[in-house]
Amino acid sequence: MNAEEAQQQAAILSSALPFLRRYAGDTIVVKYGGHAMGEGKLAHAFGYDISLLKLVGINPIVVHGGGPQISAMLDRLKIRSEFIDGLRVTDKSMVDVIEMVLSGSVNKQVTQLINRAGALAVGISGKDGGLIQARRLTRTKRDPDSEIEKVIDLGFVGQPEKIDPRVLYALLGAGLIPVIAPVGVGEDGETYNINADTAAGAIAGAVHASRLLMLTDVPGVLDENGKLIEELSADEAMRRIADGSISGGMIPKVETCLEAVRKGAKAAVILDGRVPHSCLLELFTRAGPGTLIKA
């Protein structure tokens, strides 16, 4: 590194100071999934980013997905998957496999990514400490012949009913980074497979996170011309959903962000996880690569 490069690096560090002050001591919930999880260099960068957040006094909480890994294991076991509205129909035998993959494999891989970067991360599932108390999620569909709404049984697919954050506060208080597999427990003790976006949003609201960062495989929320919308109010987001300018798979992500903000998070950001160090760019620069959603 020559003198000019060193000066540039020092200037970058100095420019981050106001942002470091802003988030010092705050809790940030990061939903980790998509391309950022499957590509080696991005995964490596993610581990270092989370470690850096902890080092500068921020309390990160990571909630991870694992859809491709689950599909791969089910294929190996010759168990067929069926999806309804993007949700995997989950019977009893399948939920055991899903829990094994999420809690026993993916969770440990993500935890080790962060540990190798120098921080102390601990992997848990939503069942640990009663963190995610869930109820069975159902969907309805109108029968085209009878016009009757029929309930569709998704099996052991869950919706967070209550978040008990005490286990998270205990880990954060001990200087540890919680890494959470999105598996919940019902009143009956049954295990429920929970969408990782939904789990992250519920947790962000419960801990009153300063930011919910949702890593995705798109730049953020786009307008009618395909241009990135840098900031959305809750009212504007709901209007765009109603008029169809926010559509498809982006709707549940935006709705998760809105629910997190309604429940106590200060703001949520839909980020392009394909951009290296996207979490750092969002928190510590004025040019965050995503869409900020707030009340």
Swiss-Prot record:
<feature type="binding site">
    <location>
        <position position="193"/>
    </location>
    <ligand>
        <name>substrate</name>
    </ligand>
</feature>
<keyword id="KW-0055">Arginine biosynthesis</keyword>
<dbReference type="InterPro" id="IPR004662">
    <property type="entry name" value="AcgluKinase_fam"/>
</dbReference>
<dbReference type="InterPro" id="IPR037528">
    <property type="entry name" value="ArgB"/>
</dbReference>
<feature type="site" description="Transition state stabilizer">
    <location>
        <position position="31"/>
    </location>
</feature>
<dbReference type="InterPro" id="IPR001057">
    <property type="entry name" value="Glu/AcGlu_kinase"/>
</dbReference>
<keyword id="KW-0808">Transferase</keyword>
<comment type="function">
    <text>Catalyzes the ATP-dependent phosphorylation of N-acetyl-L-glutamate.</text>
</comment>
<dbReference type="InterPro" id="IPR036393">
    <property type="entry name" value="AceGlu_kinase-like_sf"/>
</dbReference>
<dbReference type="GO" id="GO:0042450">
    <property type="term" value="P:arginine biosynthetic process via ornithine"/>
</dbReference>
<keyword id="KW-0028">Amino-acid biosynthesis</keyword>
<protein>
    <recommendedName>
        <fullName>Acetylglutamate kinase</fullName>
        <ecNumber>2.7.2.8</ecNumber>
    </recommendedName>
</protein>
<dbReference type="GO" id="GO:0006526">
    <property type="term" value="P:L-arginine biosynthetic process"/>
</dbReference>
<feature type="binding site">
    <location>
        <position position="88"/>
    </location>
    <ligand>
        <name>substrate</name>
    </ligand>
</feature>
<dbReference type="GO" id="GO:0005737">
    <property type="term" value="C:cytoplasm"/>
</dbReference>
<comment type="similarity">
    <text>Belongs to the acetylglutamate kinase family. ArgB subfamily.</text>
</comment>
<dbReference type="GO" id="GO:0005524">
    <property type="term" value="F:ATP binding"/>
</dbReference>
<feature type="binding site">
    <location>
        <begin position="66"/>
        <end position="67"/>
    </location>
    <ligand>
        <name>substrate</name>
    </ligand>
</feature>
<dbReference type="Pfam" id="PF00696">
    <property type="entry name" value="AA_kinase"/>
</dbReference>
<dbReference type="InterPro" id="IPR041727">
    <property type="entry name" value="NAGK-C"/>
</dbReference>
<comment type="pathway">
    <text>Amino-acid biosynthesis; L-arginine biosynthesis; N(2)-acetyl-L-ornithine from L-glutamate: step 2/4.</text>
</comment>
<dbReference type="InterPro" id="IPR001048">
    <property type="entry name" value="Asp/Glu/Uridylate_kinase"/>
</dbReference>
<dbReference type="GO" id="GO:0003991">
    <property type="term" value="F:acetylglutamate kinase activity"/>
</dbReference>
<keyword id="KW-0963">Cytoplasm</keyword>
<keyword id="KW-0418">Kinase</keyword>
<feature type="site" description="Transition state stabilizer">
    <location>
        <position position="253"/>
    </location>
</feature>
<keyword id="KW-0547">Nucleotide-binding</keyword>
<keyword id="KW-0067">ATP-binding</keyword>
